[in-house]
Design a protein with these regions (language model features):
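Short loop/turn microsegments at loop-to-beta-strand junctions
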Residues: 22-24, 82-83
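Residue-level recognition of oxygen-bearing side chains
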Residues: 40, 44, 215
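Active-site phosphate-binding/coordination module
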Residues: 43-144
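Asp-based phosphoryl-transfer active-site loop
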Residues: 24-38
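Positively charged N-terminal leader segments that act as targeting/secretion signals
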Residues: 1-17
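Glycine- and other small-residue-rich loops at beta-strand/loop junctions that grip anionic moieties
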Residues: 38, 62, 105, 209-212
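Conserved acidic, metal-coordinating active-site core of Asp-based
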Residues: 119, 123-231
Length: 231
């Protein structure tokens, strides 16, 4: 594999890394790119990607979604059988589809957990993180927490002892609120966590809290040498 500048693939949902007569690494975002308006991979798109895999190229799915929200598409595209990588949570976690190995990840410091919880409780926000195939909610789920679980195809567990329960590795948390309030809360959380995490809105009602420095493009830069691509 040789890494060249990113160029548009003939298949518009992909970026390609490589050159003529070399194996390529193709990177596809999920929402708004790989999926259609029904949040599905169309048959045409699926066949195109399977064709790419059969030619011996590698496919990487990159998304802001948590890892469990990407698993369905991994299976649909046979990446677990034919090889590929998932770049989840805006680049905070990378998994080898064939082995299930976590090849790279960045973690939130657990010191943010009680701070986010206290803030969300005070403001009446929703608050979740992820463990395995579950959304771990600090409070009874609001409509946005429910929506997030639905689009990712995962179940919700409510833990009233959330600050104590969340003592495992986490790649991101999501705070939910009405859009007009989320705009205000985003700025407040940025100030609260400025030394510990990056805070941004991925949707008008979703405020994401991720490790400092997390970026999908930077994660891809780190991943390519690990999978045999040359700079």
């Amino acid at each position: 594999y040789e890494r060249m500048r990113a160029v548009e693939s003939p298949r518009p949902f992909l970026k390609t890394f490589g050159c003529v007569n070399m194996k390529k690494i193709l990177v596809a975002d999920i929402d708004g790119t790989l999926l259609n308006s029904k949040k599905e991979i169309s048959p045409v798109t699926r066949e195109a990607i399977l064709g790419i895999l059969k030619e011996g190229h590698r496919v990487i799915l990159a998304s802001g979604r948590p890892l469990p929200g990407m698993r369905r598409f991994e299976r649909e595209l046979l990446l677990d059988l034919m090889g590929g990588y998932l770049v989840a949570s805006n680049g905070a976690k990378v998994v080898d589809c064939t082995t299930g190995e976590v090849v790279y990840q960045q973690l939130l410091p657990l010191s943010v957990v009680p701070k986010i919880h206290a803030y969300a409780k005070n403001r009446g926000c929703g608050l979740i993180t992820f463990m395995g195939d579950y959304s771990i909610s600090a409070f009874p789920p609001d409509k946005y927490v429910t929506y997030e679980a639905k689009i990712n195809g995962i179940q919700i567990q409510v833990h009233e002892d959330w600050p104590e329960f969340v003592n495992f590795d986490i790649n991101k948390c999501i705070v939910t609120a009405e859009p007009e309030l989320a705009e205000i809360y985003e700025k407040e959380l940025q100030r609260l966590l400025r030394d510990e995490a990056n805070v941004f809105r991925s949707d008008p009602f979703f405020i994401e809290v991720v490790p400092k420095g997390v970026d999908k493009a930077l994660t891809l830069e780190r991943l390519l040498p690990l999978i045999g691509a040359e700079h």
